[in-house]
Amino acid sequence: SVENGVLTIHEKVPLNFAVRGVGESYKKGEILLTKGTKLGFSELALLAELGFFHISVFVKPVVGVLSSGDELKDLGESLDNPAQIRSSNHIALANLAKSFGANALVFPLLKDKKSEVKPAIQNALESCDILITTGGVSMGDFDFLKAAVREYELIIDKLDIKPGRHIKVAKSGKKFILAFPGFPYSSMVAFHLSAREILGAWLCQKKDYIIKAFLKGSYAKKSPYLEFVACNVEFENGKVCVNLAGKKKGSSAIISNLNYKSALMIVPKERTNIAENELVDIMLLS
């Protein structure tokens, strides 16, 4: 209090009370942001405090999506016969690309016409850095994309995995071509195995998405391949657990298996069964 011009302190002041130490926020030579850091609200505030208003950043890569198949109809188009389906791959893949830091470009649906496949790929490559195609890579009579992709610098022609066995990866100069199967579940798994890794390296944001979890229940593997099985992730008594509740068995066309808090349980090629409560590797999707 102040009385007659005299300041009286009635309480003992703790040492360093209301004192900000020199260098408490950061010290000379300290690294505050590293290459590849994603700039959020805190990082931007830090740059503003330091007086940086022009900085060098990575240009977002453009991921193009080119879905193929005579059976496909786009959104808003009517299905003219029972053999036709609505295209969903381009929706899933474009949004996945955006969620992992890229800009997405969706090209018109490509028909199963051999003479149109290579020109469509070439045209798409002019507008994107990574081109993802879906369909046309399996063993069908009208699967023309596989031959077209093989004309480029082929890196991967096939993998012993399920789903996504017929995935192909090629390069055209500095650009990537990723040819995925037409089944939606397969294409979404293939994205996480390939496109996500490429984008992470491109943007210097590599991340390990594989963690350990305990399997609630058991699993019997029927294929001779390395499998990626849709599962639910939960926390139980401080442990990460997965289960297969509600996951439908069937073809690689089942989109809903990746809904909600899903992950991919990795079942090694040499395994046939996984016992209850066994510790397994799972791949997170985000």
Tell where the protein language model's regions lie, with residue ranges:
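Glycine-rich loops and low-complexity Gly/Arg-rich segments
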Residues: 7-8, 22, 34-35, 57-59, ...
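Helix-rich terminal scaffold detector
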Residues: 56-180, 184-189, 201
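Short, glycine/charged-enriched hinge/interface segments at domain edges or termini
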Residues: 1-106, 248-249, 286
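Generic structural signal for well-ordered, non-membrane alpha-helical segments
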Residues: 15, 22-25, 40, 86-90, ...
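Flexible glycine/proline-rich
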Residues: 26, 148-286
